């Protein structure tokens, strides 16, 4: 949900908005493009569950960092999570597990799942402009690992990621946002 309740006089803002570096007319929910971060792990998890037959029975190990190509993927806690199941890796939001899953899935499979969940696709909604979320082709394994945790060059609107989260509660069906003026 998004709501606009300005605490200022919108007429005064209109007079100087062209000079404002904060872009007051940008609807950050539908047009702001940001790395989705850990919310993207939903996409990586869905791809792994569909493509890796034994993934739910596996154990993963998080040491806090892993070298991938010329870079290092780190976990947000720094010291690692130790042994994890897939469920606990998702619950703890383990970057190493999801980076490893992205590498195992390969770029084409992860990108395909991202696209089935709306990345690289124009959303056409009545009365609502939503910018296209982007999952570009990773140029290295390092980029792919970070893409699997929603970092690097992956960009999404907050509305798109909310729609993906909502699909979990809606038996996998992504709902269409509605613009309303009152409840």
What are these regions (language model features)?
Residues 1-38, 43-183:
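Beta-lactam-recognizing serine transpeptidase/beta-lactamase-like catalytic domain environment
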């Amino acid at each position: 949900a998004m709501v606009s309740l300005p605490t200022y006089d919108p007429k005064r803002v209109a007079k100087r908005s062209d000079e404002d570096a904060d872009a007051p007319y940008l609807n950050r929910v539908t047009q702001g493009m940001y790395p989705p971060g850990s919310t993207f792990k939903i996409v990586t998890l869905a791809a792994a569950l569909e493509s890796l037959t034994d993934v739910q029975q596996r154990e993963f190990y998080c040491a806090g960092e892993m070298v991938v190509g010329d870079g290092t993927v780190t976990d947000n806690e720094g010291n690692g999570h130790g042994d994890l199941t897939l469920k606990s890796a998702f619950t703890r939001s383990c970057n190493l597990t999801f980076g490893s899953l992205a590498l195992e899935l390969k770029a084409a499979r992860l990108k395909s799942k991202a696209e089935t969940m709306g990345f690289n696709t124009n959303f056409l909604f009545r009365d609502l402009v939503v910018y296209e979320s982007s999952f570009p082709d990773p140029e290295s394994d390092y980029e792919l690992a970070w893409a699997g945790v929603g970092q690097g060059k992956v960009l999404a609107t907050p509305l798109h990621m909310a729609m993906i989260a909502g699909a979990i509660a809606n038996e996998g069906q992504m709902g269409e946002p509605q613009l309303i003026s009152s409840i």
